[in-house]
């Protein structure tokens, strides 16, 4: 479920955005989905794969469960996910999880753009920094709100 979407000045066309709402989304080929999968228990990920499979959207889509589990491990280690034209050819994305203090995943955020702009290591590093910073800010806001609930006598 998308809670919020925004388009930048150089956003990909509205036809692409509308088409995303007309078809099922699978977690294994999007940056947001992979960021979520990486932080779910392995049994839950296996259930999702058994239930929905690894649908191939492009030649770059991961369709092998072992390859997906390897990538999910890498995502946990590095703290972000990358969609390398796995959902739509010509579009790449970088995502980051939003976690509770105990490490449970609440959701994720991502930024996407044309592959020709997002292929350079410098640009990917810039996007990783932006998205992980955004995820961290959201986590702090959520965790601060939770802490306020634990101490109702204090007002912020």
Model-predicted regions and their roles:
Residues 1-50:
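Amphipathic alpha-helical effector-binding/dimerization core
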Residues 4, 96, 109:
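Conserved GNAT-family N-acetyltransferase fold
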Residues 31-39, 69, 129, 133:
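Amphipathic alpha-helical segments that line or abut small-molecule/effector binding pockets
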Residues 49-95, 133, 140-141:
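Short, basic/aromatic recognition patches
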Residues 98-101:
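Sensor-regulatory modules in signal-transduction proteins
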Residues 105:
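Glycine-rich acetyl-CoA-binding "A-motif" of GNAT/NAT acetyltransferases
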Residues 108-156:
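Juxtadomain coupling helices with adjacent low-complexity linkers
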